Amino acid sequence: MHINKAEARKILSQKRAALTDAECMKMDDLLLIQLQRIDWSRTEVLASFYPLAHKNEPNTLLFEQYIKTLYPFIRFCYPIVETATHQMDFYFETETVQLNAFGIQEPLPFNKVAPELIDTMFVPLLGFDQKGHRVGFGKGYYDRYLAKAGEGIQKIGVSYFEPMDNFTDTNEFDVPLSSCITPWNTYEFE
């Protein structure tokens, strides 16, 4: 059965909202096991995002702690969203963070990262389909950023759920993932 992204967003938002804290913690541990299978040795700059606990997002901070321990040379950066222009840029992490208008943590805007410097990116999502198209929160920030970042970036989705059937309404502006990790599998798309 095929589904459009709006329907998928609704279904996946409900599924994620129904997760308990214990279920999220267990799935984060399983996601970490999948992430340990990735060779991070060629990554120099990894773009990530601060998880929204109230939205039951995967705990990227747990994943980063693991990566930083084994690969201390990797530099992490995080997005700052410009709501007025619907654009987003990444900045190297800072010890202190600020909250944006949506209540999302952001680094202080000191060291902007050129898109071509990012090797790998954790891409937030609600879910994904069998071709690597993601469904996010519907604002298009990541698709716009990835379009200007170029082809070389590894786009890794991290999902609590397995892929859905293919979305019926993808278009040329949708940037597919390189891979997506779930608690039970890793899916490669490129």
Give, region by region, the residue ranges found by the protein language model.
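N-terminal active-site beta-alpha-beta segment that forms phosphate/nucleotide-binding
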Residues: H2-L99, G103-P109
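Conserved phosphate- and dinucleotide-binding cores of soluble alpha/beta proteins
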Residues: A84-E190
